[in-house]
Swiss-Prot record:
Name the UniProt record assigns to this protein: Large ribosomal subunit protein uL13
Gene3D superfamilies: Ribosomal protein L13
Similarity field: Belongs to the universal ribosomal protein uL13 family.
Keywords for this protein: Ribonucleoprotein, Ribosomal protein
Classification lineage: Bacteria, Pseudomonadati, Pseudomonadota, Alphaproteobacteria, Rickettsiales
GO BP: any one term: negative regulation of translation
GO molecular-function term, one example from the UniProt record: structural constituent of ribosome
Entry's Gene Ontology cellular component terms: cytosolic large ribosomal subunit
Gene from which the chain derives: rplM
Length: 152
């Protein structure tokens, strides 16, 4: 029996939409990262971009468990000496771009490298309930009903 290798033409990418209102950030990010990689498909191939396109709406209404909203710290560096910057999820969610919390969580759950960067481009996060991908007829996924711990 020969090993099956997926070809570029055989990839069937679907469009999925997830409403993030009231969902726990870490659980949502892990689920979305698996969808972007295509791990839920039987024809999953590690060296191919066989994952789906994922749209997340209501990104500003996500929840953190415990005291992570105030205590968790995101670090970044400007590249200059003494340029270490810190921020919390609370500052980001109340700021100008609240969708960055979900984007950072999903990006950090993907592996590093060019394939992960290509997969990450298939993620679309919006802070409101509207999105501009109605033409693709996305399929709605009720992530909250999959496990009682997914919703807070």
């Amino acid at each position: 029996m020969k090993t099956f290798f997926l070809k570029e033409k055989q990839v069937d990418k679907k469009w999925l939409v997830i409403d993030a209102e009231g969902l726990v950030v870490g659980r949502l990010a892990a689920f979305v990262a698996a969808l972007l990689r295509g791990k839920h498909k039987p024809e999953y191939t590690p060296h191919m971009d066989c994952g789906d396109n994922v749209i997340i709406v209501n990104a500003e209404k996500v929840h953190f468990t415990g005291k992570k909203l105030k205590d968790k710290i995101y670090y970044r560096h400007t590249g200059y000496s003494g340029g270490l910057k810190k921020t919390t999820p609370d500052n980001i969610l109340n700021g100008k771009f609240p969708e960055r919390v979900i984007k950072m969580a999903v990006k950090r759950m993907l592996d590093d490298g060019p394939m992960a960067r290509r997969r990450f481009e298939n993620l679309y996060v919006y802070s409101g309930s509207e999105h501009k991908h109605q033409g693709q007829q996305p399929e709605k996924i009720d992530f909250a009903s999959l496990n009682r711990k997914n919703k807070k």
